[in-house]
Regions:
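Conserved tyrosine-mediated DNA breakage-rejoining catalytic core shared by Y-recombinases
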Residues: 174-218
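A short, glycine-centered helix-capping/turn motif at helix boundaries
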Residues: 152, 161-175, 273, 277-282, ...
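N-terminal DNA-binding module of tyrosine recombinases/phage integrases
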Residues: 1-33
Length: 325
């Protein structure tokens, strides 16, 4: 048993820290097995812990104080992140489900939980994009990049990388720029690996993107403003969370002023552009009718785009380019 105190003690006997207690309770619940499941729940639990400690959270460090209202507040926080474009619906629902599972492991009952994560978030998981992504106009994006460069050059590099390569925010921040530049120059394609999400194949799954002039330019700019002694956009002594707070958040506000909801929109714009390159038809969300004309080609494009975006399922492409119509 991982219990370190009385069952009715702090964090139900699993220690003084909320961040430690959750994973310990999960290990007990799964009997020391199901490593991948425990790891996934534990990672999502840490996101809940960070929110609890944040200015927006309840400021607690004891699972005994977590009640249904706190979970409802957390659901509202996640819903806000989804609305802002910072989090996918699936990720938000997974986080709520993992908090439910971890609370059950800590408490030993199902009394404190979010009854329906999808209802709590007020949205359906199977999302299909119905509005064209912002940031498809490259000239508009480059004007934003120039504006960002005046105050936050590294945020400008992130925006340019996201639009050129379809990288996620974390991937753009942690990308090994020297390696990518070498691959671009020698192979004509780059393999996005750093900062990727886990999933079934993890960060080792090949994710090659064909290089064009836009990618070459984005990599040159990012490498140029990369901090001294760093191989990515983080300074050697800089924490990722500090970078998000001090650089990304102000940059996101500027994106909003230029009618772009977030960096994720630039990723979707990349996907729509790739669909048009592959099929010679506009993306469905832009009014394209490739599916009606050539279903096989539409399917091939969706699979290719899904892989380039770092997903393993073809249906995920609909969240970026629209459904089959």
């Amino acid at each position: 048993m991982a219990l370190v105190g009385r069952r009715d003690g702090r964090n139900f006997g699993y220690g003084r820290q909320l961040s430690y207690a959750g994973p310990q309770a999960l290990r007990d619940m799964f009997g020391g097995g199901h490593y991948g499941t425990v790891k996934a729940h534990s990672d999502r639990w840490q996101a809940f812990v960070r929110w609890c400690r944040s200015d927006d959270g309840p400021g607690l460090n004891d699972a005994r104080q977590v009640d249904r209202q706190i979970l409802a507040d957390y659901a509202a926080h996640l819903r806000h992140l989804v609305d802002r474009g910072d989090l996918s619906i699936a990720t938000a629902q997974n986080r709520l489900s993992s908090v439910n599972r971890t609370m059950a492991a800590l408490r030993g009952d199902q009394y404190v939980k979010v009854p329906s994560p999808s209802k709590a978030l007020g949205m359906q998981r199977t999302t299909i994009r119905t509005t064209a992504p912002q940031g498809q106009d490259r000239e508009h994006v480059m004007r934003i990049v120039e504006t960002l460069s005046e105050q936050h050059s590294r945020a400008a590099a992130i925006a340019q990388l996201a639009r050129a390569t379809g990288m996620r925010l974390r991937e753009a921040i942690l990308a090994d720029l020297a390696r990518l530049k070498h691959e671009a120059e020698h192979y004509g394609k780059i393999n996005i690996q750093d900062g990727t999400k886990g999933g079934r194949s993890g960060a080792s799954a090949p994710r090659w993107i064909r290089v064009d002039d836009h990618i070459h330019e984005a990599l040159r700019f990012a490498e140029q403003i990369s901090p001294r002694g760093s191989h990515n956009l983080l300074a050697p002594n800089e924490r990722y969370l500090d970078f998000q707070r001090e650089i990304v958040r102000p940059a996101r506000d500027l994106l909003h002023k230029h009618n772009i909801k977030g960096f994720h929109e630039l990723r979707a714009a990349f996907a729509c552009e790739r669909y048009e390159q592959i099929t010679q038809h506009q993306a469905p969300v832009n009014g394209g009718q490739c599916y009606a004309v050539d279903r096989r080609l539409d399917c091939e494009a969706r699979m290719q785009i899904s892989k380039e975006l770092g997903h393993s399922r073809i249906d995920v492409a609909a969240a970026y380019i629209g459904g089959r119509t």
